[in-house]
Amino acid sequence: MLPESFFLNDDVLYLAKELLGHSLVTQIEGKTTSGIIIETEAYRGPDDKACHAYNYRKTQRNLPMYSRGGIAYIYQCYGMHALFNVVTGSQNLPHAVLIRAIAPQKGEDIMIQRRQWQNKPKHLLTNGPGKVCQALNLTLEHNTQSLTSPQIHISQKKISGTITQTPRIGIDYAEEYRDLPWRFLLNIKKSKKI
């Protein structure tokens, strides 16, 4: 698994790209599931108007962002979807990387069951941040958990591919930060065994 030192880099854009190709692994309720991280978004407080910690805003929900890098920041979006973020950087520097999509690896059958995704297109199983949490069984209970634990961690091994940058999704309110290319997508060649 990646060591805590990996997450302490203060350059959240670098880490959002660097996380691509690593596997996010969960061992929850006796079931192991994992997927290659193929889509991320960087959120850089305090200057990023799309970030929960813009202008050093602190709320009960975003307090994990002010922690030392290497923990999970999981919050509920629209009152129904849990979203998983990797807290990065130094203590009190509120940066996080949203994991937007994974390519299933281990336990795909478990992910299908958790998402009730039988007889549906597999390429849509984990192609959104709420879907990732549901498939990996990540809930608000896992908020602030260390990402160097057996329960939730990111693999050291990395798969390479072509990286594309685009603007982030769903942040029309973020003014001049709306169009910054802080969303990163990894294109893995289909010939590579995932």
UniProtKB/Swiss-Prot annotation:
Q: Name one Pfam family in it.
A: Pur_DNA_glyco
- Superkingdom of the organism of origin: Bacteria
Q: Which residues cross the membrane?
A: none
Which keywords label this protein?
DNA damage, DNA repair, Hydrolase
EC number in record: 3.2.2.-
Biological process GO terms, please? base-excision repair
What InterPro entries is this protein classified in?
Formyl_transferase-like_C_sf, MPG, MPG_sf
Q: Answer yes or no on keyword Secreted.
A: no
- GO MF term list: alkylbase DNA N-glycosylase activity; DNA binding
The record's HAMAP family line, in alphabetical order, gives:
3MGH
Q: Which NCBIfam families match?
A: 3mg (TIGR00567)
What family is it from? Belongs to the DNA glycosylase MPG family.
Q: What is this protein called?
A: Putative 3-methyladenine DNA glycosylase
Species in which this protein is naturally found? Chlamydia felis (strain Fe/C-56)
